[in-house]
């Protein structure tokens, strides 16, 4: 996560110095500085300082320094210098990511916090996810892209520390917010009789996620440095024990912010999916049961798509880092710069997809986006959209520490005392939770001429949580 462009800049300096035979000391100095960087580009940097004057600088991405006047014209060619049209296309691509991610996630935050109906446990974690994604897009994506294009750090020493520190923090907060949602869905569906997280407990979990994220990213902040070179300023991370320590740290980061949480979410959503889509529950089912089951499926389906999107977007970036660290000759490949820009763009684009997914798969978020863009002549907000965020479809009542949705049916019973024995023997046994025919809808027959069907959703939970 630390500065890719800084390593490339050192490569550029080393290659330019090596190309000028009169400045061997500068080449050695550049190579030593590159070694201090401790990035995955270390071997390339050392090699660049010892290249012959006939080999151009193998920098995967940035404009190079001007060669010495005495350098032969044939040596000026650099395969990594991009044409203007390509820079314009990359700028447009990164600009779209920043715009959609920032404004889309801010609207998601507004939809949840401004409407009481949307303030559920799951949605509080979605607020945290949206905040971390919007922050990543606003404070990291564009700055890193500018640095990669210009090979110069314009933003000062303090922002250099922030730039190397915050991306890991934001990604950690994002993926563990998704993990918390997965665990919450698991508890609500697999063990619904246990109390759900309260608003206070949810805030504590969110705070704990950010504290752990800060601790994981702290070394990046402590070891960040800026260095003023002739004509440019660099931002990089200098690890005390060199590149090996850097590589180990990033492997740990990949495990903690990618492999481990995806494993947890894969297990939980697999179990939840088998439960929700495994087959029809035997016995008669009431309408409310079917409706709540359908709502639960929609929420789980949406979150699975969010997780899969995140995994796909970040996988090429992690593969790129590991391969270029192990097989350093890849850094000389003609198209390595484009591969990096594409993998980094795909990773950063993960911040913009979630608002689109929410809008497409959840009618309340869709109604909220319509309200946010009601000023647009192509967007029409219906009365249904207005009511969707303001009213509740069900009015749960608190009974024995449980929220229930109850449907009452009345019937008339003619009772003949002479048939009492036959009535007792033919009376249907009431289904219980241990009965395989029990499906959440209980039916009670009695002499009092009333039949009650009730569905117990989960403790402290209403249908609002799943709609």
UniProtKB/Swiss-Prot annotation:
It is found in: Cell membrane. Residues 110-119, 184-203, 273-301, 362-467 are cytoplasmic. A lipid is attached at residue 376 (S-palmitoyl cysteine). Keywords: Cell membrane, Disulfide bond, G-protein coupled receptor, Glycoprotein, Lipoprotein, Membrane, Palmitate, Receptor, Transducer, Transmembrane, Transmembrane helix. Its main location: membrane. The keyword Repeat does not apply. The chain crosses the membrane at residues 87-109, 120-141, 162-183, 204-224, 248-272, 302-323, 337-361. Residues 447-467 have a biased composition (Low complexity). It holds the Pfam family 7tm_1. Residues 1-86, 142-161, 225-247, 324-336 are extracellular. Disulfide bonds join 160-235. GO terms for molecular function: tachykinin receptor activity. Residues 416-467 are annotated as: Disordered. GO terms for biological process: positive regulation of flagellated sperm motility. SUPFAM superfamilies: Family A G protein-coupled receptor-like. The keyword Cell membrane applies. Glycans are attached at residues 23, 50, 75. SMART domains: 7TM_GPCR_Srsx. One of its GO terms (cellular component) is plasma membrane. Belongs to the G-protein coupled receptor 1 family. This is a receptor for the tachykinin neuropeptide neuromedin-K (neurokinin B). It is associated with G proteins that activate a phosphatidylinositol-calcium second messenger system. This is Neuromedin-K receptor. The lineage of its organism: Eukaryota, Metazoa, Chordata, Craniata, Vertebrata. The gene is TACR3.
